[in-house]
């Protein structure tokens, strides 16, 4: 597979979906991914805000770097963050992760009878994580859009499904 070109964040029970997505990416699409277990997006944000405050109050000192930025140093490529909370939870890291972040979460109201259907409905199951990663690679110019379209079909992604946040 070579060096990982994707970073996958998973939290709580969704970590298993990220691990499965890593396996699918490697086996079906020959794309390596690192999986990161995020125990608290809120704590990562608090720490980053604390660093930001310190930097603001100490302009003559060398800038400090938030932990989330330090941890990702040397790990390139898009970052797909999946959670069983709303997308805004991982989105709160976007000031430090920039445009490489794609957040997946449970925005809206589910009409699912089990967890597997719920995760598929909200597009944060392993197949949706793979689809988001491939789409971001394509948008960044690193993967042919035709390959992504074929992968969406292979993964059973309904590209015309109603947005779960508005369903």
Residue spans for each PLM region:
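Thiamine diphosphate
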Residues: 1-167
């Amino acid at each position: 597979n070579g060096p990982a070109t994707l970073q996958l964040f998973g939290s709580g029970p969704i970590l298993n979906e990220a691990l499965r997505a890593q396996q699918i990416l490697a086996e079906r699409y020959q794309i390596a991914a690192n999986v990161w277990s995020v125990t608290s997006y809120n704590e990562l944000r608090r720490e980053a805000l604390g660093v930001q405050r310190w930097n603001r109050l100490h302009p003559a000192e060398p800038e400090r770097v938030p932990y989330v930025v330090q941890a990702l140093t040397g790990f390139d490529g898009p970052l797909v963050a999946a959670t069983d909370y709303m997308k805004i939870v991982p989105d709160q890291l976007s000031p430090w992760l920039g445009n490489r972040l794609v957040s997946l979460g449970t925005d809206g109201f589910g009409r699912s009878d089990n967890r597997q259907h719920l995760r598929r409905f909200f597009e944060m199951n392993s197949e949706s994580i793979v689809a988001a990663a491939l789409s971001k690679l394509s948008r960044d110019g690193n993967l042919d859009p035709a390959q992504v379209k074929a992968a969406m079909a292979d993964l059973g992604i309904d590209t015309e499904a109603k947005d779960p946040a508005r369903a």
